[in-house]
Amino acid sequence: GPESAFLRL
């Protein structure tokens, strides 16, 4: 979910 994109920072 959206949290996955956050983890890519």
From Swiss-Prot:
Record's subcellular location:
Secreted
Primary localization class, coarse: secreted
Has UniProt tagged this entry with the keyword Disulfide bond?
no
GO BP, one annotated term: neuropeptide signaling pathway
Residue(s) carrying Leucine amide: 9
GO CC, alphabetical: extracellular region
Superkingdom is: Eukaryota
Keywords per UniProt: Amidation, Neuropeptide, Secreted
Relate the protein's function as given in its record: FMRFamides and FMRFamide-like peptides are neuropeptides.
Family designation: Belongs to the FARP (FMRF amide related peptide) family.
Q: What is this protein called?
A: Extended FMRFamide-3
Species this chain originates from: Striatophasma naukluftense
